[in-house]
Amino acid sequence: MLASGSTARARMLEQAGIAFTVDVAAVDEEAVKHSMAAETRNPARVAEILAELKAVRVSARHPGALVIGADQMLDCDNVWFDKPADRQGARAQLLALRHKTHRLTSAVVAVRDGRRVWHHTEAAKLTMRNFSENFLDGYLDQAGEAVQTSVGAYQLEGLGSQLFLSVEGDFFTILGLPLLALMDFLRENGELVP
């Protein structure tokens, strides 16, 4: 059971041949992030808490089921970024990230009967190139509303790759799910054939 509405996460699981169903948890992520900001500036901890909260909420509706929750945080220069609400927000985010290195931290949590049974957090570092504003406007025109579907206003697996100079870290983590670690856990627990 996947406690996420992310099409990227669902696509990764499908392409890996993992059977699952989706049940999206109703979580006010902004409220959680706001309250956590006062407690910690650790994006890995916030991603883990959000992932667990989603999985626990869905687990309550599915007794006995293994529920996977995931979340991702983007931080740059001690600032947390969210999915942009519109083109203007996407443009502002990309300008703030231009010619800088930012970190994407992805957390995945497994919950059964309301209890966390496993978790994993992984981070990747991405450096954007010093693109021109002319390029940026063309990118936003071509990408369209897709820029609103992911934190950072890009999809590295597509057109967004043109924004980058270098990437350090696991590709699946960048897409929002540390898939290799998750599959290892699923094999160890009899959910996948070893």
Curated annotation (Swiss-Prot):
It catalyses: a ribonucleoside 5'-triphosphate + H2O = a ribonucleoside 5'-phosphate + diphosphate + H(+); a 2'-deoxyribonucleoside 5'-triphosphate + H2O = a 2'-deoxyribonucleoside 5'-phosphate + diphosphate + H(+). One of its GO terms (cellular component) is cytoplasm. GO terms for molecular function: nucleoside triphosphate diphosphatase activity. Its EC number is 3.6.1.9. Disulfide bonds: none annotated. It is found in: Cytoplasm. It is an enzyme of class 3 (hydrolase). The keyword Hydrolase applies. This is Nucleoside triphosphate pyrophosphatase. The lineage of its organism: Bacteria, Pseudomonadati, Pseudomonadota, Alphaproteobacteria, Rhodospirillales.
